[in-house]
């Protein structure tokens, strides 16, 4: 395409003076495009951060993060954005953060989402955790797939027993009705995950298989996990879930597989309690 004759081509380390403002440029490849670049205004100490520090969601009049309830209304979407778009590229995000931390920044202006002018360190710390695959919260999340409701029941019973053991804020998700982007974000947030899945055509229920491959593709690591399978004749879901999980880095996987044959039986509650013990020790 035609390029305007007055266009100035810039590269890493270049600066442009517009009077009192001096703009410096730095490449942040794969955050989230290969050619991504940020701009720093040394006079106002503003970092124009491109997609970094952005979120899903549209502004509703207020443009600054300190003008909204960011923790309650925006943080989940900020996490979901970062981990789903560049979760795989923790290294490049770390490189971008190292460049940013050498600057005296008073304001961060992302391409989308609120502008940051207060508590910058708090949000930068979130990026530090997300890009190093460090869990934010000491919570258990149970993710299940269920065909007839029996695996769902087992997941709910397990969640109740986790609560009885003192676990706070246990979350339970049906992978068939929850968009994978939310589940990936929850897996990045929590430090412990239980996957419950029925055997389907000698394999995994498709929604659970998709989720596990999404987690692997986004480089999830450093989690404590357990699996629960359901299968009446030849249950194989547990083995296949573990095969995918074992390919992820630094995962602590519960050795035993709890097998439900059609419906959870009372004499299997002790097996659920062993998962609870593993998750809470």
Predicted regions and their residues:
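Short N-terminal or domain-adjacent regulatory/targeting segments
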Residues: 109-136, 210
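Short, charged N-terminal beta->alpha structural module
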Residues: 143-165
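Conserved hydrophobic helix-helix packing surfaces used for dimerization/oligomerization
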Residues: 23, 46, 140-142, 225
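Active-site-proximal loop/helix segment associated with metal-binding centers of metalloenzymes
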Residues: 32, 52-87, 131-136
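Catalytic core of the metallo-beta-lactamase
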Residues: 2-67
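Short gly/ser/thr-rich secondary-structure transition/capping motifs
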Residues: 6, 29, 124-125, 172-178
């Amino acid at each position: 395409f035609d390029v305007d004759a007055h266009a100035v081509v810039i590269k890493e380390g270049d600066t442009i003076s517009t009077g009192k403002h001096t703009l410096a440029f730095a490449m942040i490849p794969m955050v989230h495009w290969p050619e991504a670049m940020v701009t720093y205004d040394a006079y106002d100490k503003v970092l124009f951060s491109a997609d970094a520090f952005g979120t899903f969601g549209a502004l509703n009049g207020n443009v600054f993060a300190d003008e909204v309830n960011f923790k309650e209304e925006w943080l989940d979407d900020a996490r979901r954005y970062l981990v789903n778009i560049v979760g795989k590229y923790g290294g490049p995000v770390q490189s971008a953060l190292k460049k940013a931390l050498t600057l005296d920044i008073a304001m961060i202006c992302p391409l989308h989402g609120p502008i940051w002018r207060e508590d910058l360190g708090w949000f930068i710390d979130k990026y530090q955790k997300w890009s190093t695959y460090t869990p934010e919260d000491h919570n258990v999340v149970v993710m299940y797939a269920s065909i007839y409701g029996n695996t769902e029941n087992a997941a709910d019973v397990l969640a109740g027993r986790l609560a009885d053991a003192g676990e706070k804020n246990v979350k339970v998700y049906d992978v068939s009705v929850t968009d994978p982007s939310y589940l990936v974000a929850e897996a990045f947030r929590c430090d412990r995950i239980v996957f419950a899945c029925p055997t389907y055509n000698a394999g995994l229920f498709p929604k659970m298989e998709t989720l596990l491959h999404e987690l692997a593709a986004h480089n999830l690591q450093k989690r404590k996990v357990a699996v629960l399978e359901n299968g009446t004749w030849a249950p194989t879901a547990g083995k296949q879930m573990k095969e995918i999980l074992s390919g992820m880095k630094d995962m602590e996987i519960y050795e035993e597989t709890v097998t439900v044959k059609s419906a959870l039986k009372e004499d299997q509650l002790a097996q659920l309690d062993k998962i609870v013990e593993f998750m809470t020790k």
